[in-house]
């Protein structure tokens, strides 16, 4: 094992110090070898790999080679590795700096993750997005929640979208009490699969626009509870917008059986026409029998 580690270190040192060659084919081979050399450092002892990785980052190498070096740093459990990642993240307003931010997320180091807050506050939109990605990778819901509390506009939307991807239902519910209901929050409830929050909003008629958005978003969650609730909402609704939203929700969830049930129980020709149109959109096999029966006068 010591022989293998020694071979890796010698190979890496030689390849990473190789000068660039003019010929494109030879240059490509050299680049691939440098990448392989850096990746090989994953098996090297930390005290041996760290100096070589640092040398790569300080040298005249391509971003692709340096990005591999950043990953190796993320796997080295030493303070020096974390400080180097933070240094690259803070000092490079480019793809390399953004990659360093994401690598901090992969490392999962609590102190480094906490330091990303200042990069978020002072960085551009790409830097802020990279910080959110790092928190997602690390599973740090609290940090994303803290950002959402004070963020506005697109930054707020991106933060709650990230929370939804992380399945942070409790945090999203808490945000409702602090920031109010918005279309972005409704979509976040849908992505996180929060049926209860959506159902509560879907049954609240104080704001019809938000209500209809919540009803349609329930279709994204899907499942038996959603399907039965959408049918119930349709039957009890008096507003046309709400009824149509319920149909859209069933269309999204693929609940053609519910639309078929409503069609068969309806006695209103105008309503049956609309329901038939939705049945066609759902792709229900039964719709062709209904059309055939209608054309032959059986319905």
Protein language model regions, located:
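Bacterial N-terminal signal peptides that target proteins for export
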Residues: 1-8
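N-terminal signal peptide c-region/cleavage motif recognized by signal peptidases
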Residues: 17-19
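Amphipathic alpha-helical scaffolding segments comprising HEAT/armadillo-like alpha-solenoid repeats
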Residues: 22-27, 46-58, 78-90, 98, ...
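N-terminal, post-signal-peptide region of Sec/Tat-exported proteins
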Residues: 31-78
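Positions within the helices of HEAT/ARM-like alpha-solenoid repeats
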Residues: 33-34, 64-66, 95-97, 126-128, ...
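Core register positions within helices of long alpha-helical scaffolds
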Residues: 40-43, 72, 103, 134, ...
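Post-signal peptide N-terminal segment of secreted/secretory-pathway proteins
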Residues: 64-67, 71-83, 93-103
């Amino acid at each position: 094992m010591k022989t293998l580690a020694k071979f890796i270190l010698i190979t890496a040192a030689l390849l990473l110090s190789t000068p660039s060659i003019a010929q494109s084919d030879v240059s490509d081979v050299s680049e691939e070898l440098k990448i392989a050399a850096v990746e090989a450092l994953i098996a090297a002892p930390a005290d041996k790999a760290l100096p070589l990785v640092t040398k790569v980052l300080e040298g005249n190498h391509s971003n692709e080679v340096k990005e591999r070096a950043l990953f190796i740093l993320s796997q080295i459990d030493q303070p020096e590795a974390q400080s180097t990642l933070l240094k690259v993240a803070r000092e490079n307003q480019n793809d390399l700096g953004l990659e360093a931010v994401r690598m901090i997320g992969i490392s999962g180091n609590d102190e480094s993750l906490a330091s990303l807050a200042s990069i978020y506050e002072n960085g551009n939109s790409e830097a802020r997005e990279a910080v959110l990605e790092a928190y997602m990778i690390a599973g740090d819901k609290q940090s994303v929640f803290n950002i959402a509390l004070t963020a506005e506009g697109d930054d707020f939307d991106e933060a709650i979208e990230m929370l939804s991807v992380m399945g942070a239902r409790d945090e999203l519910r808490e945000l409702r009490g602090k920031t109010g209901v918005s279309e972005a929050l409704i979509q976040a409830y849908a992505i996180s699969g929060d049926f209860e929050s959506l159902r509560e909003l879907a049954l609240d008629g104080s704001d019809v626009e938000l209500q209809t958005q919540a009803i349609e978003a329930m279709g994204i969650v899907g499942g038996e509870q959603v399907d039965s609730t959408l049918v119930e909402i349709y039957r009890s609704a008096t507003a046309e917008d709400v009824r149509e939203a319920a149909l859209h929700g069933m269309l999204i969830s693929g609940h053609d059986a519910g639309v078929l049930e409503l069609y068969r129980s309806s006695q209103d020709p105008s309503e049956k026409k609309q329901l038939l149109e939705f049945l066609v959109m759902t792709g229900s096999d039964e719709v062709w029998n209904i059309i055939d029966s209608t054309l032959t006068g059986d319905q």
